[in-house]
């Protein structure tokens, strides 16, 4: 709840993500002042990192967990926790990049049930084909419109939404 005091942009993105019906792509060229604060905010909200250690220490996290499909808080063992992934050029921050890209684009993840949110840096802004992206958020200022178009193009690709029902073949 306090994130709004420090970053209204991250606060608004988190509000929109909670209403998401599919995979969410978020771009920032900044790691220390973009991707990491956003990842920490996601963890605080109840989203865990896919297969890697969370950036927060475990005892600092609240006991709230977000369901990957409904995006509602859940507890217990009978739900599928929402996960995020970081795709960057930094090996320490993205040690399993190839595996996570494979899961992200797999047809079993078309609804985000395995990885719901993908945070990308400039390293993934060109040459990577994502599938079934339903939302694209750009955290950075719009100083470079060509870069912005490239990032939006990661989520809107020819035939990238064909596994989804017709009414869900859109990106916001």
Language model region names:
Residues 1-40:
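Conserved helicase/translocase motor-coupling segment
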Residues 22, 29-34, 45, 91-92, ...:
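Short, solvent-exposed loop/turn segments at secondary-structure junctions
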Residues 25-27, 117-119, 137:
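Structural motif
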Residues 41-49:
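Conserved helix-turn-beta segment of the N-terminal RecA-like "Helicase ATP-binding" lobe
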Residues 52-122:
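Conserved helicase ATPase core of P-loop NTP-dependent helicases/translocases
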Residues 129-141, 150:
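A short beta-strand element within the Helicase C-terminal
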Residues 144-167:
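Conserved SF2 helicase motif VI
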């Amino acid at each position: 709840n306090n994130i709004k005091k420090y970053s209204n942009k991250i606060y608004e993105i988190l509000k929109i993500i909670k209403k998401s019906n599919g995979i969410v792509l978020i771009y920032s060229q900044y790691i220390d002042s973009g991707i990491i604060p956003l990842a920490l905010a996601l963890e605080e909200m109840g989203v865990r990192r896919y297969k890697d250690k969370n950036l927060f220490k475990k005892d600092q996290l609240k006991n709230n967990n977000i369901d990957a499909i409904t995006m509602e808080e859940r507890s217990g063992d009978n739900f599928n926790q929402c996960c995020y992934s970081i795709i960057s050029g930094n090996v320490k921050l993205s040690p399993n990049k190839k595996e996570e890209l494979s899961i992200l684009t797999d047809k079993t993840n078309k609804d985000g049930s395995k990885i719901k949110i993908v945070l990308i840096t400039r390293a993934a802004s060109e040459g990577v084909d994502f599938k079934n992206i339903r939302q694209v958020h750009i955290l950075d200022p719009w100083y470079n419109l060509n870069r912005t178009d490239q990032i939006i193009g990661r989520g809107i690709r020819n035939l990238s939404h064909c596994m989804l029902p017709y009414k869900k073949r859109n990106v916001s």
